[in-house]
Amino acid sequence: IRDRLLASQKLTFSLIGDESLSKRPMKRIITPLTAMGCKISSNNGLLPLSIDASDGISAIDYDMKVASAQVKSSILFSALGGNNVSSINEIIPTRNHSEIMLKNMGALIESEGSKIIVHPLKSKLNSIDISVPSDPSSAAFFVALAVINNNSNLKLTNVLLNNTRIGFVKVLNKMNCLISKSNESIHNG
C-alpha cells in the first residue's frame, strides 16, 4: 500500500484496492498514522481510505500491538517525512526489508534492541537498484515435499534467505534435514 510513501507528503489523497485488498483491515495502519497527525476516513476500517496529511507528520514513539511488517513499514516511511525523531518498539521482530532498503538509500535508521529509531530525512533518498528474490514461504511447500520423499534432491535459485523470513528452514535444520545454501549474497532489502 502506498500509504507508507504518501503519508509523509503534505497532501490529501485516496487509496483504493482490488477485491482482496479491500477486505483487509486497515485499522492497524490507520491508528499510528492518525497519531502522527494524518486525518483518515475509511469504509468501516477497510479501503478505500482518504488520507489528509496536509498539516504534516508528527514524530511518534509507537509500541507495536501486533507483529506486522506492513504496520512497521507504514510508520517507517511516514516518519521519514516527520518533524522529529520517531521510534517503533517491536514486541516480536518482523521482517526487516524496509529498514535495510531505506538504510541503503541513505535514511538514518538505527536499532537499539527491540526499538527502531527513524530520523526525518534531511535530503532526498538515493536511488538504488533493487532485486526482488523469490518468496521463501512459496518455496517452503517444495522444500517440505523434498524432505518427506526419500532420496530427493531439490535445488531452488534466487530465494530470499533473510533471517527474519526463514523460520521453516531453521526448524528443518533442527530436525537434521540436510539443507545447504550456496551463492549467498546481500541485496538492498
What are these regions (language model features)?
Residues 1-189:
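Structural preference for solvent-exposed beta-strand-turn elements
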